[in-house]
């Protein structure tokens, strides 16, 4: 009994230590500059408080839950903390600290879910991952805010002791879409798996209805601005996957955004026999790998999947992304490293290629199985090498 108590106290102290380190690193790193997104959120919040349209006059590309979250955080006041030297020296001062703490708490909740459903190790692979720390503490992007609700919806659906779990899970998935539409195709993936027609209808209608309603009241009077900001204005076509594997004719005659959307739907069909939780992890990887455009903050999206399926390829993905974050202009932007490597935007876009390639290989391994993947890969290598050898043979 004494040994068990000592063991429990040790594990509890270790847990508290890791949680403290995770929060501390996220707050500590926010002192090293800020991202353009934070400046845009400040500007959009000012418009919102003035009663002006964030879609017509601002550069706001999400549904309304995030602007309401920013507004609530702005109203919170802690004078004792606001006047400290550390806070006053941080870009954005206490308002930014509140955002960092809020997003850190979101990360902590995901960590708890991973800890309870898997292990402390898997939870820490997410919570102490440098990608997560930098995106939350420095960049202040809120992708995990949306992913948290999506993850909760999956876990609750798998709990067969909960009544009306299909409805509750669909509501949570709808909230996820409203916060940020990362999982925009996932209701379709889910619907493909359901056997009953009524369940298919629920998992499609409920989430998408919540997503659409989350634009109220702007959707009524400012539909054009909502449509342009959310779906049109910010689109680019520089996705690394399509640059590596897309023939030139694709880039000439097809929209990469359309191809990305079609591919995500097709993958939902292909993974119809996979468990819902597995499909959720695969989706988080696929939405980044096959994206028609790429920003550094996208690289945080598959972190839950990385933690669950952790192997040397995901370690390499983490290392490459962390090194990119040190020099990229949207992230830590360390000048002495940028000067050494003469880093610029073009270098960042080139760096995306090996990162996405590593993630793609890991994705194929997990989705089709390592044995099948390596058997197929060996056949391809053997075929190509035979063709090369036959093409260079000559008679003496």
Describe these PLM feature segments:
Residues 2-235, 253-396:
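Multi-pass membrane glycosyltransferase architecture that uses lipid-linked
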Residues 236-242:
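Cysteine-nucleophile protease catalytic domains, especially the papain-like/related folds used
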Residues 242-249:
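A cyclin-like helical interaction fold
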């Amino acid at each position: 009994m004494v040994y068990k108590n000592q063991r429990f106290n040790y594990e509890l102290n270790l847990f508290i230590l890791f949680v403290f380190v995770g929060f501390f690193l996220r707050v500590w790193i926010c002192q090293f500059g800020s991202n353009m997104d934070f400046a845009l959120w400040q500007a959009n919040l000012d418009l919102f408080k003035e009663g002006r349209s964030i879609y017509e006059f601002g550069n706001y590309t999400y549904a309304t839950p995030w602007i309401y979250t920013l507004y609530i955080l702005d109203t919170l006041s802690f004078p004792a903390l606001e006047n400290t030297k550390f806070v006053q020296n941080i870009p954005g001062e206490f308002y930014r600290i509140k955002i960092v703490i809020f997003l850190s708490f979101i990360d902590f909740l995901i960590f708890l879910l991973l800890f309870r459903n898997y292990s402390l190790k898997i939870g820490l692979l997410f919570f102490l991952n440098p990608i997560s720390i930098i995106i939350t503490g420095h960049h202040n992007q809120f992708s995990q805010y949306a992913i948290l609700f999506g993850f909760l919806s999956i876990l609750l659906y798998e709990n067969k002791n909960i009544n009306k779990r299909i409805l509750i899970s669909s509501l949570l998935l709808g909230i996820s879409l409203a916060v940020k539409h990362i999982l925009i195709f996932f209701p379709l993936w889910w619907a493909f798996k359901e056997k009953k027609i009524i369940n298919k209808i629920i998992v499609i209608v409920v989430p998408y209805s919540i997503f659409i309603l989350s634009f109220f009241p702007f959707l009524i009077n400012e539909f054009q601005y909502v449509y342009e900001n959310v779906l049109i204005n910010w689109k680019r076509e520089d996705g690394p996957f399509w640059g590596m594997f897309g023939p030139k004719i694709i880039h000439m005659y097809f929209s990469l955004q359309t191809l990305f959307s079609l591919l995500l739907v097709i993958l939902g069909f292909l993974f119809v026999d996979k468990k819902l939780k597995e499909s959720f992890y695969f989706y988080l990887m696929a939405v980044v790998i096959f994206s028609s455009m790429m920003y550094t903050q996208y690289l945080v999206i598959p972190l839950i999947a990385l933690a669950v399926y952790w192997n040397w390829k995901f370690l390499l993905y983490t290392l490459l992304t962390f090194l990119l974050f040190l020099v990229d202009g949207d992230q830590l932007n360390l000048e002495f490293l940028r000067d050494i490597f003469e880093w610029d935007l073009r270098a960042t876009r080139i760096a995306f290629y090996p990162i996405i390639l590593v993630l793609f290989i890991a994705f194929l391994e997990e989705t089709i199985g390592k044995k099948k993947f390596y058997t197929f890969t060996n056949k391809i290598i053997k075929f190509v090498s035979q063709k090369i050898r036959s093409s260079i043979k000559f008679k003496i």
